[in-house]
Amino acid sequence: MDEIMSGEANDIQKSAYLTALAMKGETIDEITASAAGMREHCTRLLNDMDVLEIVGTGGDRSNSFNISTTSALVISAGGVPVAKHGNRSVSSRSGAADVLEKLGVEVALTAEQNETVLNETGICFMFAPVYHSSMKYAAPVRKELGVRTVFNILGPLSNPAAATMQLLGVYDKELAGTMVEVLSNLGVTRGVAVCGEDGLDEITLTGETDVHEIRFGEITSYTITPEQFGLSR
């Protein structure tokens, strides 16, 4: 991954590596190392507070509205610092950047600008193309391959502020368990990976949601239902 992100690997090497990983299935250690490699080559947002990331993998084909961005605003208003990392729409009606631009927010802020915004308001948005410029080395090969690769799940794991708290929506039940292990490996001390039984990369209102929770290195798994929160299906 380091050679891909630094531009040292050629297209044949990139294709072979990504295809081989996809065919055999990425392990927890391989996903962790890949995410760490992306973080190593990103522009960092420096801060002296514990911040929360709330994001989904996408890929659930639900065409839902951008739940994570609206939730981020509510969470921040409740006093939890949020450093959200995101991009434009992939599988939903609108991505985080699309929503914020419609609200009049300048999304392409530098790390220095976002440090000020975070300290003053308790929330900031890190637009992926600004912070992960090294993705330019992977983008052409990903487009040519035209299949799902490890990069499809690395975005939610590559927060430039090194968030220690995270709520991660995952489109696949089995993958959610893997992703929570990766989050723990990457330094998240409090967080959850969730997957709705209907395939949403969200906490669903139509049935049960699988939850995998990290609390300072200890991982527990359980399910929740809408009824537990006074909501009907």
Task: For the regions a language model picked out, list residue spans one by one.
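Acidic, glycine/proline-rich low-complexity segments that act as flexible tails and inter-domain linkers
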Residues: 1-63, 74-78, 82, 232
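Generic structural signal for well-ordered, non-membrane alpha-helical segments
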Residues: 10, 14, 27-31, 35, ...
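A glycine-rich phosphate/pyrophosphate-binding beta-strand-loop-alpha-helix module
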Residues: 18, 65-121
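Glycine-rich anion-binding loops and their surrounding alpha/beta cores
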Residues: 40-43, 64, 79, 101-108, ...
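Acidic, glycine-rich active-site loops and adjacent beta-strand->loop/helix elements
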Residues: 56-61, 86-92, 131, 197-198
